[in-house]
C-alpha cells in the first residue's frame, strides 16, 4: 500500500460550477491541486511502483468525478509499461449495490465505520446557517451509520479483489524506468487535454 494522498482535483472544469452550486460563494477550504499536478504526480507514482517491483497497481480514489483523468494517465502509462493499472473511485466499486454521494449517507457511513472519531453527527444542521456555506452535504447525511459503512467497505474490498484477479500481473523482469522514460506518456496525456474531465482554468 502506497501512502494515501489527501490532495485531489477540484475547482476546475465541471468541479468549479458544481462547487458553487453545492457550497456557495465562500472559500471552500479544499485540499485542491491543479489537474495537471495531480495527474503528473500519479504518472510518476506509477513509475515508482514499477521500479519498486510491483507488477500490478490498483488506484482507488475517494474523490468521485475526476477518475476519468486518472484513467487517462494509467492508459498512457500502460502503453509504455506492460503492467495492469486499474483505476476506480470508491462509488464505482459498488455501483448498482450502494448509491454513492457527497458528504451523505454513503460517504459518512464509511467514515463512521473506519474513523468514528472524525465524525460529529450533531453538526449536520450547520448547513442551514454556517458562514462556511453548505459543505456540499447530501440531504441523507443524517441516515449515516457505521453498520451501513461496514457493508459498503466490505463490498468494496470484495470488488477490489475481483478486479485485481481479473487484471493479473505484468512480467517479472522489467528494466528500471528513468524519469525521461515516462515523459512520452505525459506528452500523450497533455495532447488529450481537451478531453480531460477537469479541463479548464483554475478558479479564484
Sequence positions of predicted segments:
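Extended, histidine- and acidic-residue-enriched regions that form the cofactor-binding/catalytic faces
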Residues: 1-58, 62-204
Amino acid at each position: 500500500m502506497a501512502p494515501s494522498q489527501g490532495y485531489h482535483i477540484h475547482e476546475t472544469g465541471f468541479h468549479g460550477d458544481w462547487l458553487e452550486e453545492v457550497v456557495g460563494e465562500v472559500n471552500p477550504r479544499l485540499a485542491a491541486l491543479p489537474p495537471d499536478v495531480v495527474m503528473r504526480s500519479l504518472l510518476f507514482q506509477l513509475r515508482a511502483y514499477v521500479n519498486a517491483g510491483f507488477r500490478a497497481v490498483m488506484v482507488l480514489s475517494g474523490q468521485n468525478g475526476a477518475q476519468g483523468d486518472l484513467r487517462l494517465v494509467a492508459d498512457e502509462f500502460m502503453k509504455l509499461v506492460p503492467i495492469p493499472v486499474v483505476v476506480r473511485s470508491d462509488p464505482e466499486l459498488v455501483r448498482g449495490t450502494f448509491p454513492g454521494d457527497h458528504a451523505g449517507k454513503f460517504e459518512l457511513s464509511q467514515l463512521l465505520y473506519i474513523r468514528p472519531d472524525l465524525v460529529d453527527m450533531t453538526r449536520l444542521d450547520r448547513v442551514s446557517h454556517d458562514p462556511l456555506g453548505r459543505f456540499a452535504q447530501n440531504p441523507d447525511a443524517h441516515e449515516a451509520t457505521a453498520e451501513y459503512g461496514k457493508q459498503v467497505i466490505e463490498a468494496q474490498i470484495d470488488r477490489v479483489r475481483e478486479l485485481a484477479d481479473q487484471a493479473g500481473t505484468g512480467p517479472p523482469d522489467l528494466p528500471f524506468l528513468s524519469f525521461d522514460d515516462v515523459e512520452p506518456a505525459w506528452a500523450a496525456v497533455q495532447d488529450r487535454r481537451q478531453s480531460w474531465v477537469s479541463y479548464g482554468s483554475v478558479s479564484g
